[in-house]
Structure formats: structure tokens, C-alpha cells
Amino acid sequence: MKNLFILFLAMIFASILFIGCSTEDNPLAPTDPGNGGGDPDPIVIKTPRFMHIESISVTGFPQNKPNGDTWDWNPLSSEERKPDIEVVLQRSGNHLPVFWSDRRKNANHTSTYVFTKPASSDDGKLPYDVPYSQTWMISLVDDDFGGKDQMGSVSVKPSSIYVKDNATNFNKTLTSGSLKIKVKGAWIY
């Protein structure tokens, strides 16, 4: 009899628990999706205002010019005839550069070169804030005795690089043929 009474009380308790649950929204949480809770701080995906470029790295470039010639044509400037590389950051179109880097002499096409300093105080500086909705170019240039040779360029479009994850930093490698340029920095919201 005692066991029957305990079983009866357990059934009444279970019934009260099930009756207390409902499918109605919780009136204390009007944003409740109907599951009895609610996210007090829903995640909002932000759109950055700027791509804050802190450094530009060259991790690979063509060993020779498209016609097969070496980059340095003057054998007196370098026995190995390797390029003296610089990077240029500018808005796409016919815009003046906002950053022109210092030079790396006799660069090896498989080595990594990090650029953060300008060639002179008149050549801009990094970090630089690229507006989110604009397209920019980073060009690699060979500074020769006979002039500057364009070695290639990559397009930098922040809206194509951002992955809508509210990230703080970015580290993205952009490629064009055998040219590989890495941009590193932070998103500004």
C-alpha cells in the first residue's frame, strides 16, 4: 500500500510538471522564438568601415619576365640578375600611390619579404586604412638601373576578403599567376 501511495504521488508530481509546460511564448521574453528562453544578446554581424593594412608581404613572384629575360638586365648591378623589389599600394584606376615601400635588393622569387616602411618620408606609410567599399591594387615593382619594371599586381577588395564573422584581424594571401602577396592587419568597425 505504501508503494502504491508513493507511485500515486509521483504520477501527480509528473502531471503537474507536464501541465506547467506550454507552447505559448514566455510573456517575460517577447523576443522568445517559442522555446521558453530567448537570447538576451543576439549576434549582430557588423560591416567594417576600413581594412587597416599593417604590413604587405611578398611570398612569391615570377622568376623571369614574361619574355624569359631576367629582371635585372644590367650584369654590373647583380651577378645573379635578381630584381630589386618594392611594393606599391594605390586605389584602382589612375590614382597616385598612398604607399611606396623601401627596396629589397637581389630578391629571391621563393623567399618572403615583409614591407612596412616607405622608401622615403614622401612615399606614404603603413598602416593604411582602405575603405571597405573600394578596390585597391598592390603592385610589385623591380627598381632597375634602367627604370622600374612592373612585375605584377593583385586586387585588394575588402568586401571580398571579409567573411562576415566579426573578426578583429585578417591575414590574407592574394595571388595573380605566380605573384603571391599577403596583406595583414585589422578590421575597423
Model-predicted regions and their roles:
Residues 15-52:
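Bacterial Sec-dependent N-terminal signal peptides
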Residues 46, 80, 129-133, 174-176:
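Surface-exposed coil/turn segments at beta-strand junctions on protein surfaces, enriched
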Residues 68-78, 141-168, 181, 187:
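C2 and C2-like phospholipid-binding beta-sandwich domains
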Residues 102, 124-128, 170-171:
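Beta-strand-rich interaction surfaces with strong enrichment in secreted/lumenal proteins
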